[in-house]
């Protein structure tokens, strides 16, 4: 990284914005900020600045994170409703998800340009030696360049291939173009900016892990070998998500079915176990990487042990959320003829907010992410509620549900689970409240912009 640029503003964009966007597209669930923040710390960033930058930037890629999981899986409570309408000429669940993804890009993309400029100004104002906004704002050309690098493939993929690959492809292509342009000085600020001497930093900026002062790094493998697993993941995902190639239908044909669950007729479920991203490509590439990186047995053991340890919390949360969603959906089946919980909430809020709801819908998604720790779980909990709100108010269901998905993405920056994880990896455990106080303002700004766009689309 030091060979590309020593300007901390540039490093924040490359690592905190672009690299984290790619990791979000591939893995999600809090991984990007937890990976990117220690990298910034190693480059000499104050721990507090590294944590806040990575949390805030991990927002617009999130709706398409983990190969589209927040939309493809998160909106699954709507699948029975949509499937029931297909016979009458209604759209399929897959078509609905694609349209929701398209609207998500329209709400997210403005922030892919606004947020970098704002955050660099924030960084130089609160963590710079001169305490000015202008030093960060002066890198606006580079921020616009980064926004174009990410947003163009992000938008194209969402509108052509669907909601699974926009962040992954946008981050991968954007990262390559951004690094290439940076090395050649394209839109790079003329002066190099830094945080100043460590001894002048405020004590609250640092934690138990000291920021690195190293300027040299000696790699233990080539760039090609380091990036090869990510490239293979991206290639396999693209090849298996294009229907015309036939791989998508073939992989989806392998199903694990559960019929008449617990003895109840008609209560069935199935899993396309080979089409799941966790199987192909992630598990497949994880096994291939052992050979590609010539990993030793102990390294392989440590990697898998760490992976399963990190999976515990999100797995438990997802199991609990799916069960809770089933209760929400089933609450409408009762002898008293009462509405389901989501529908009852929707009717009450529709009466209170009226036509102002599109301006507020994203904050519900953000609240869900704040509480549950995930955009996916937020969508699982509130997608049917948003659907019912749109039905009550006669708004486009796709737009209102998209605002929910976008809200879950922007909620990542205040999400308790993510904040705790980032604080742990940069040595700031105990400072979570201070960080949320800082990230709340970008969250509020994000929601205002999304609300304006949603209102424009609806009206």
Describe each region flagged by the PLM.
Residues 6-38, 42, 56-59, 315-332, ...:
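Hydrophobic alpha-helical transmembrane segments of multi-pass integral membrane proteins
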Residues 170, 200-364:
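Transmembrane helical segments that form the transport core of multi-pass membrane transport proteins
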Residues 63-198, 406-459:
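Juxtamembrane and boundary regions of transmembrane helices in multi-pass small-molecule transporters
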């Amino acid at each position: 990284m030091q060979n590309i640029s020593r300007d901390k503003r540039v490093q924040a964009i490359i690592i905190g914005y672009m690299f984290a966007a790619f990791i979000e597209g591939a893995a999600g669930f809090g991984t990007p900020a937890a990976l990117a923040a220690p990298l910034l710390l190693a480059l000499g960033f104050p721990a507090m600045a590294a944590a806040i930058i990575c949390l805030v930037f991990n927002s617009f890629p999130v709706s398409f994170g983990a190969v589209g999981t927040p939309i493809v899986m998160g909106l699954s409570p709507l699948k029975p409703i949509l499937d029931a309408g297909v016979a009458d000429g209604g759209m399929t669940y897959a078509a609905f998800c694609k349209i929701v993804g398209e609207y998500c890009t329209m709400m997210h993309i403005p922030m892919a340009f606004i947020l970098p400029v704002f955050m660099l100004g924030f960084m130089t104002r609160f963590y710079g030696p001169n305490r000015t906004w202008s030093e960060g704002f002066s890198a606006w050309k580079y921020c616009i360049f980064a926004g174009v690098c990410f947003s163009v493939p992000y938008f194209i993929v969402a509108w052509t291939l669907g909601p699974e690959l926009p962040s992954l492809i946008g981050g991968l292509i954007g990262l390559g173009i951004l690094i290439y342009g940076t090395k050649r000085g394209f839109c790079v600020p003329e002066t190099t900016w830094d945080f100043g001497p460590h001894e002048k930093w405020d004590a609250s900026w640092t934690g138990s892990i000291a920021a690195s002062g190293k300027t040299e790094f000696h790699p233990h493998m080539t760039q090609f070998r380091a990036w090869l697993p990510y490239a293979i993941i991206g290639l396999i995902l693209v090849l298996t998500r294009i229907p015309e190639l036939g791989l998508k239908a073939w992989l989806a044909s392998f199903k694990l079915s559960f019929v008449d669950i617990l003895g109840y007729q008609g209560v069935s479920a199935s899993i396309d176990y080979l089409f799941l991203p966790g199987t192909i490509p992630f598990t497949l590439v994880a096994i291939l990487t052992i050979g590609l990186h010539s990993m030793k047995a102990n390294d392989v053991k440590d990697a898998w042990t760490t992976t399963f340890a990190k999976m515990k919390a999100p797995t438990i949360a997802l199991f609990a959320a799916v069960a809770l969603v089933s209760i929400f959906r089933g609450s409408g089946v009762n002898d008293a003829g009462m509405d389901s919980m989501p529908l009852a909430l929707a009717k009450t809020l529709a009466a209170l907010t009226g036509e102002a709801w599109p301006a507020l819908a994203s904050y519900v998604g953000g609240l869900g992410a704040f509480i549950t720790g995930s955009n996916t779980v937020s969508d699982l909990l509130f997608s049917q509620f948003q659907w019912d709100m749109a039905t009550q108010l006669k708004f486009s269901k796709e737009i209102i549900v998209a605002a929910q998905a976008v809200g879950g993405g922007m909620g990542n920056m205040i999400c308790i689970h993510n904040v705790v994880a980032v604080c742990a990896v940069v040595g700031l455990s105990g400072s979570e409240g201070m960080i949320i106080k800082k990230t709340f303002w970008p969250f509020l700004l994000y929601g205002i912009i999304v609300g304006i766009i949603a209102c424009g689309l609806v009206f």
